[in-house]
Amino acid sequence: MKNIFKLMALFAFVLCFASCDDDEDTVLPTLPVTAANLNGVWQLAEWNGQPLAEGTYCYIKFNRKELTFEMYQKFDSMYARCITGSFKIKNDPYLGYVLSGDYDFGNGEWNHDYIVTDLQESGSMVWTAKDDDSDVSKYVRCDKVPDEIIAEVKVDE
């Protein structure tokens, strides 16, 4: 009889540890990539896992109704620029949501199409270049493009 109680205590002890799984990852639900979910202002927070260099920035303001964007950036030039254009979203059955765009004034297409993942309700998303999976950008939602950046763009125009 003592052996049965010892055996039951051993099983209870083992089951207590078996039910606790620390390796389980919490998966946050993601939103579908639609013009409505992209609508608003997004700031480039990380590029290839690194924060942006001091003095550089990129803000993208998406307009869901017109399917247009305004990009305020100081990235590839010493002057701030506002670049405008239109965007498209395609749901590829193999890649997921692919975002592409065209610049206004005949300036061509974006350099890459981007696979958009991890669009969180909390306000972040990840873009990976479709043809270069080492080009990864993380964007976070913000209320607006800072006034000083808009002023800097107007001075430089």
Regions flagged by a language model, labelled:
Residues T26-Q43, E157:
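N-terminal helix-cap/turn-to-beta initiation motif at the start of protein domains
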Residues L52-V98:
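N-terminal glycine/threonine-rich, aromatic-flanked beta-hairpin/loop signature
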Residues N39-L67, D102-W110:
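Short, solvent-exposed loop/hinge segments that bridge or flank secondary-structure elements
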Residues D21-E24:
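Bacterial signal peptide processing site
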Residues C82-D92, T128-E157:
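Edge beta-strand at a domain terminus
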Residues L95-D118:
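An anionic, turn-rich surface loop/hairpin at beta-sheet edges
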Residues L15-S19:
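C-terminal motif of bacterial Sec signal peptides marking the signal peptidase cleavage site
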Residues K2-L10:
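Sec-dependent signal peptide recognition
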